[in-house]
C-alpha cells in the first residue's frame, strides 16, 4: 500500500490506497516545489543547477540555467517568487515580470552559510533556515564557512536589517507555521528531529522544545533525512523522512507515512483546491491526492 497507517486519524487525511503518481523524472536531485498561479509547478534540480517548470499539458521546461543551485522556494503575499540560492548564499525575490532583488546575503560582515528553505508570514516577514549544505560538493559551491553557527533568520516586511531568531541548530532545514502562526516548527536534519517554538512580536521565538524525535538516521547517502516540511489546514505536520512523507498530528503523534519510491527532499500543496501534495524525490517528482487541503498561506488564493 502507498500509505502506512499508524492511526485511524490518518484515514481522514488520505486514502490508504491513494496513488503516489510519478509525473516527471530524469533529474539529478529535485527540491523546492512551489505551485504557481498558472497551474504549473516550479521546482529546483539542485545539483543539476537548473530551475524547472512542470505543467500537466506542457510537460517539463527549464526556467533558469544556471540557477545558482537554488533550493527552497515560496511565494510572498504579492505573488513574487522567494528563492534560496546555495552558490550565492542569498535569499532573492523575483517578480512575475522578471525583476530580481537580493534580500539577504550576510549576517554582519560574514556571508550566510547557504539559505535552504523559506516561508512567508501573513505580515510579509520572510523566515528562512541557513545550514551549511550549500558549501558542500555537489549541493552548492564548496568553500569555507564564515559563520560559526547555523541559524534561522527573519527578513522584516518591506526590508530592513536581517534578524537572527535562533542559532543553536546543527543543520536547520524545513520549517512551517501553525495555522494561526503562533507556533513555528523547524526541523534539524543532523539531529533527526523537529522543534517547535512559541512566536511572539516580530517573530521572536521562545520556549523551544521537541515536537518529534528520532526521524530517520540523518544519513545523506541513505536519503533517510528530515528535510522539507509543510502543514495542512487542520494543523497536521508533514515532513520528509524514512520511506517518504511522515504525517504528525498537532500534538506530535506519528499518524503514518505516505510512501514514496525514492528518497524525498521536499513537498508542497498544489492544484486549484490545494488538495494535492507535490513531492520532489531524488530523480523525480510525484504527487498524491489528499482528503485535506494545505494550510492557506498568503499566496494561496
How should each PLM-predicted stretch be described?
Residues 25-40, 66-85, 89-90, 107-126, ...:
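Beta-rich, blade/repeat-based domains predominating
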Residues 196-205, 289-297:
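Short loop/turn segments immediately following beta-strands, especially the blade-tip
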Amino acid at each position: 500500500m502507498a500509505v502506512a497507517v499508524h492511526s485511524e486519524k490518518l484515514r481522514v487525511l488520505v486514502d490508504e490506497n491513494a496513488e503516489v503518481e510519478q509525473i516527471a523524472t530524469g533529474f539529478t536531485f529535485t527540491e523546492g516545489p512551489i505551485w504557481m498561479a498558472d497551474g504549473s509547478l516550479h521546482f529546483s534540480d539542485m545539483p543539476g543547477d537548473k530551475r524547472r517548470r512542470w505543467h500537466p499539458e506542457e510537460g517539463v521546461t527549464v526556467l533558469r540555467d544556471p540557477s545558482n543551485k537554488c533550493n527552497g522556494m515560496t511565494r510572498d503575499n504579492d505573488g513574487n517568487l522567494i528563492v534560496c540560492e546555495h552558490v550565492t548564499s542569498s535569499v532573492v525575490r523575483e517578480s512575475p515580470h522578471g525583476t530580481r532583488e537580493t534580500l539577504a546575503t550576510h549576517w554582519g560582515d560574514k556571508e550566510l552559510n547557504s539559505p535552504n528553505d523559506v516561508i512567508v508570514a501573513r505580515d510579509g516577514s520572510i523566515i528562512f533556515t541557513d545550514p551549511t549544505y550549500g558549501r558542500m560538493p555537489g549541493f552548492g559551491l564548496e568553500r569555507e564557512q564564515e559563520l560559526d553557527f547555523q541559524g534561522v533568520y527573519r527578513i522584516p516586511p518591506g526590508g530592513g536589517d536581517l534578524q537572527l531568531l535562533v542559532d543553536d541548530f546543527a543543520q536547520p532545514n524545513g520549517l512551517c507555521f501553525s495555522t494561526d502562526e503562533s507556533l513555528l516548527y523547524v526541523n534539524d536534519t543532523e539531529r533527526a528531529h523537529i522543534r517547535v517554538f512559541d512566536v511572539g512580536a516580530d517573530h521572536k521565538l521562545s520556549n523551544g522544545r521537541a515536537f518529534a524525535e528520532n526521524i530517520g538516521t540523518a544519513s545523506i547517502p541513505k536519503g533517510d533525512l528530515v528535510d522539507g516540511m509543510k502543514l495542512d489546514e487542520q494543523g497536521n505536520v508533514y515532513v520528509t523522512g524514512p520511506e517518504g512523507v511522515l504525517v504528525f498530528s498537532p500534538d506530535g503523534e506519528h499518524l503514518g507515512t505516505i510512501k514514496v519510491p525514492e528518497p524525498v527532499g521536499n513537498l508542497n500543496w498544489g492544484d486549484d483546491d490545494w488538495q494535492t501534495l507535490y513531492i520532489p524525490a531524488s530523480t523525480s517528482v510525484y504527487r498524491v491526492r489528499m482528503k485535506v487541503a494545505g494550510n492557506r498561506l498568503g499566496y494561496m488564493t
